[in-house]
């Protein structure tokens, strides 16, 4: 697996896990980018938008434009993937105990 693919799969999982811990199960794209940075996942704004668009296509999150950011809300399917109860190719599966 290429490093870029590994990074993308990890970023997708990180977004989902962040949303499961957020009040109302939602956040905005700017805060999500900052959270990824804290985990040494350095993605551009365009890359974050691509990650979010992919997660929407998979039915794992919904988004709503609000000014220059997107408000992102996790779906039940996304919560299942974040917990490792369900798997989606393209999202890193959490390790036991994560």
Indicate residue ranges for each PLM-predicted region.
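Short alpha-helical segments that sit at the start of domains
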Residues: 1-26
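Short acidic, hydrophobic short linear motifs in intrinsically disordered regions
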Residues: 25-35
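Minor-groove-contacting beta-hairpin "wing" of winged helix-turn-helix DNA-binding domains
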Residues: 68-74
């Amino acid at each position: 697996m290429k490093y870029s693919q590994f990074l993308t799969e990890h970023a997708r999982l990180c977004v989902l896990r962040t949303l499961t811990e957020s009040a109302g199960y939602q956040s905005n794209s700017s805060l999500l980018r900052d959270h990824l940075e804290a985990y040494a996942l350095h993605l551009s704004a365009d890359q974050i938008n691509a990650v979010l668009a992919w997660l929407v296509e998979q039915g794992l999150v919904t988004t709503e434009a609000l000014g220059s950011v997107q408000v992102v809300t996790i779906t039940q399917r996304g919560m299942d993937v974040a917990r490792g109860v369900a798997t989606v190719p393209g999202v890193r599966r959490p390790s036991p105990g994560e």
